[in-house]
């Protein structure tokens, strides 16, 4: 092959390699993407099926029920409330009336959390949930 043909083959292989790397990177990103939803979003059916997502809001007063290491509590955005089941150790800041972000999936209409993060100040809550909480609070 001539030098020109060698360069063309090299450029073609380089373009194919970069395209393949970009495709695999985007695919991995989309597979690991966690959607963040409020209880209203979940109630309206916006939760992904058979995929983990984050549910955020405020812990409803008098809703926390402990059974050993298992915990059941309700999360609200002041418009809708959603039941959460969690098995594990809760963060120190977890308490009624506090903000919470849970990661998990829906199983038969109940959110089964695999991770619970307690909100410690206003900067911790993602803007989407803070906006949803503010809108719901203003409607009351």
UniProtKB/Swiss-Prot annotation:
InterPro entries: CcmE, CcmE-like_sf, NA-bd_OB-fold
Species per Swiss-Prot/TrEMBL record: Vesicomyosocius okutanii subsp. Calyptogena okutanii (strain HA)
A UniProt-annotated Pfam family: CcmE
Cytoplasmic side: 1-7
Annotated Gene3D superfamilies: Nucleic acid-binding proteins
Task performed by this protein: Heme chaperone required for the biogenesis of c-type cytochromes. Transiently binds heme delivered by CcmC and transfers the heme to apo-cytochromes in a process facilitated by CcmF and CcmH.
GO cellular component: plasma membrane
Binding site for heme: 120, 124
Record's protein name: Cytochrome c-type biogenesis protein CcmE
The family this protein is said to belong to: Belongs to the CcmE/CycJ family.
GO molecular function: heme binding; metal ion binding
One biological process term in Gene Ontology: cytochrome complex assembly
Sequence ranges on the Periplasmic membrane side: 29-140
Localization (cell): Cell inner membrane
Gene that produces this protein: ccmE
Spans traversing the lipid bilayer: 8-28
Annotated keywords: Cell inner membrane, Cell membrane, Cytochrome c-type biogenesis, Heme, Iron, Membrane, Metal-binding, Signal-anchor, Transmembrane, Transmembrane helix
Membrane-topology annotation of the record: Single-pass type II membrane protein
